[in-house]
Structures are given as structure tokens and as C-alpha cells.
Amino acid sequence: LKPTNGHFGKIVEFIKSVNPDIVGLIEVDFGSYRVERFNQAETIARELNHQVVCKSKYAEASMARKVPVLNKQGNAILTGLPIVARRYHFFNEGVKRLVIEVELQEVIVFLVHLSLKFRHRQYQLNDLHALIAGCDKPVIVAGDFNVLWGDRELQLFLAASGLTSANVRSQFSYPSRNPYRELDYIFHSPEIRSTGFQVPQIKLSDHAPLLWDFEIDDPKTDGLVLGNSAVVARPAGPSVPLTASVL
């Protein structure tokens, strides 16, 4: 495996330039030899002055936890907003099973990276719906959904959950050099209003980033209670991909 630090500085600068309130990182390196033992999630968090919520993407009993480099791959959510609660869930199917849940004062954020296998993805979407159904606040769900058969895979999940894609024009993000697939998504509850979305054509990783601006209204007062911005980017290496989501 080759080191992945070549674009890391540029990725950090890109994230800082967006000045996001919430950041999600998928398959970020927590300190393997290929990044010279430093924790990428903590490094980005320090640059943004954010808190970090992170965990290995593999379940405790997974063989991947015993494999060098893979055992340092995980997901993370960073935020400069007050955190009410943080929770880690693991799907029952697939190799990549982690779901990170971060509850903020006005919204709950989920970060996922779904399986490459169709059957496993469908089971994971069912589990994800069950998690969302138990929420009592507006929800944002973001990450790499790996829908290799297209967004038809997501229709039942979206219909059941009531979530909407922030990417209303279905702009492609993969591969970044010549995008022709929509694998990365940001979904949100109807209480959240999109005010802007774009896919910048930068090639710091194998996936192009997603940028999203949104607001949340308080139905009790008809007033704005939270204005925010979101990004999804992937600082991937050549062999073991990394994903960065800035939400």
C-alpha cells in the first residue's frame, strides 16, 4: 500500500475553506504507517476547532480488526456545535457495518458507508430505517451508499423514512476524474430546508465532494433555529479508500 498523505494538506485546506459546522469522515485513517501514525480525523478537527466522534468501521469481532492498516480505518463526525449525545451502531450484515449517530440540539446526524453487496445493502437500509424511525428530531443521513444498481435501490428506504435527497439534480460524484455515478448522498427530513447544493469538480480523491447549505425552521415559532452548511468529500488513497464527509 502506498502512503495517502499526498493530498491530505490540500483536503484540509478545502474543508477549512468551506467553514462547515458539521464534518463527517468515512474511511479516515486513525494512525496507520501509511499516514505516518497520525490520526487524520483528530488533525482535521484541530484545524477546524471541532469536537471529534470516531470509531473503527469494523465490528469488534471482525477479522479486519486484526489486519494492519485496515484496523486503523474508521469513520468520524466532527462538529463545532454542542453535542447532546453520541452513539455507535453496527449493522447486522456486511463487512463495513458502522453507523455513527451524533445528536445536536436541533438535528440528529447519521454517517454511513454501506456494503458493496446488494443484498447486504438492502438489509443495512432496513436497519437504518429502524434507527431513523426512533428519532424525535429532524434527521440528516449522509455517506457513501454504494448503490451500484442506481438510486432505485433507495426508493423503498426513502418512501418509508420520508427523507429527501439534498442532491435534487442527481449530480454525479464518482469517479472524480470523470463522474458518471451517484454513490454519495445526503438525505434529510422535510423540516430541513435546502438553500444550496453543489458538487465541486476537484480531484483530491476518487470521489468528488458534495457541498450543501441548509436551514431548520422551528414550527412552533416559524423562526429559523439553525442555519448550516454541509460537504461530502473523499481523501482516498490508491489502495484503501478514505472518505471525508463535511456535513
What is the meaning of each model-derived region?
Residues 83, 88, 103, 120, ...:
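Metal-dependent phosphoester-hydrolase catalytic domains
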Residues 3-4, 27-106, 198-201:
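Structured beta-strand-rich core segments of catalytic domains in phosphoester-bond hydrolases
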Residues 30, 114-116, 147:
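Short, glycine/acidic-enriched loop or turn micro-motifs at the edges of active sites
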Residues 26, 112, 142-144:
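Active-site flanking residues adjacent to catalytic metal/cofactor-binding acidic residues
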Residues 1-47, 54-57, 62, 217-247:
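N-terminal, active-site-proximal structural segment of metallo-dependent hydrolase catalytic domains
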Residues 37-42, 123-129:
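Charged helix-capping and loop-helix junction motifs
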Residues 107-111:
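Conserved catalytic cores of phosphodiester-cleaving nucleases, focusing on short active-site segments
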